[in-house]
């Protein structure tokens, strides 16, 4: 096997299919829940956004970007897949927020019809092994999604990695993908449809996510915070939307976002020299919101120090982290 070159591009081309054009009726509908799981930073949120054809889950190069379970719905003719993008499962549980994120991810595995197990190319860690062990013990059909294959120089290594994992667990399908480039996600959608049970659709065809515009606004601000700040902040910052109003006079949304950090040094980091960093964060967040909401957005941001919020379950409950459990 090692002497044969595995042509992933040919594999993409040979299996890609278009969307269904069959009219949907209750008698022939298929619908099911699909959990997207994996360790932090393997591309789960990018994959969800690609599968849905629009951005509903924030992405970042930093691990543990997703803190909540995000539900996205993709309807294609008779088939409706209800995807759940989970926080990355990880071994480290020192803080209350980390424990809650693990619980949120684990609880997403209850009552699902299919699991997409996302791994990063040929890179395998202790966190991957932990997720793998959980899936071995669970009684769910699992599709192995080997993501970021475009970043692996030796394509034979990808094939060998898939073969090794398939020896340890019986996957219903194994699909090499590049979620960022959209490579092979049509093939993955086909495999998902093949495993959806016959059932009436849960949501209207135009429905995309269960998350409110208020929630999406907070996630967009948090994404920009992670994009424009250092490595320390993802675990120590959250965003609370204190105001989210539509004003018919301006035909726009007026949004007040409170950024909570744990230390004064972090506050200074977010604000930046002469307030330049918080201005950049606010501007980029506002542009994304306007694109998502389709209206003018008037965004104001504040930064406040709230020591120990990530270890305070009452604070986490008020911020919506425990509602996911």
From Swiss-Prot:
Residues 38-45 are annotated as: G1. Residues 64-68 are annotated as: G2. The keyword Isomerase does not apply. It comes from the Bacteria. Residues 147-150 are annotated as: G4. Coiled coil: none annotated. Monomer. HAMAP family: GTPase_Era. This is GTPase Era. It comes from Vibrio cholerae serotype O1 (strain ATCC 39315 / El Tor Inaba N16961).
